[in-house]
Amino acid sequence: MKNNKKLILASGSPRRTELLKRLGCKFQIVPSKIEEKINPRLSPIQNVKRLSRLKALDAASKISDGIIIAADSIVVLNGEILGKPKDMKDAEKMLQKLSSKEHLAITGVTVIDAETKKIAQSAAVTKIKFHNLNKNLIKRYFKLVNPLDKAGAYAIQENGAMLIESISGSYSNVIGLPLDKLNQLLGKFGVSLM
């Protein structure tokens, strides 16, 4: 498949940018400015799909052509949505909650053709189990990584692997952009990541 349309990433996330760059994708960044508020009446998957759609629509309002990619990620533990921590104390509480437990990384992805307004959406779910995390390990981890811009207060690609006992599903989803789902969505627009 040939990529004749420009790709627009509606995210300021350095992790999503890095994932696309590693594939050799050429794209522009038009970050969305929407407030990422969870709707408690919606399921986790409905929330990430809704927020990724709002981000994509926000970017689409700023440009006239191109294929817009937007994503939103959360961590879910026993039905509780863990977004980005409010502060370091909140981040520490999140990792203590995740200690020795299985949780889900869920990312909603929306692709919009800015010209035709065609929309396609998907979501990915990855199961992750953490090792037992003591306070010293959490403090050492926070010296290596700023947890405040990360759902669940960790990043698998930034020394977060040392926290993880097992993972089942898309690794790139845990980073914040499930490349398999994204490539399927882009195919609906005649575009491929590779």
Segments (PLM) and residue ranges:
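A short beta-strand-loop structural module common to alpha/beta enzyme folds
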Residues: 28-37
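Flexible, glycine-rich phosphate/dinucleotide-binding loops
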Residues: 16, 36-38, 118
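Cofactor-binding loop segments of dinucleotide-utilizing enzymes, especially the Rossmann-like FAD-
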Residues: 12, 32, 114
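Short loop/helix-cap segments at secondary-structure boundaries that form the rim of catalytic
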Residues: 18-22, 39, 61-62
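N-terminal beta1-alpha1 ligand-phosphate binding loop
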Residues: 2-25
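Anionic-ligand binding patches
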Residues: 2-7, 29, 41-194
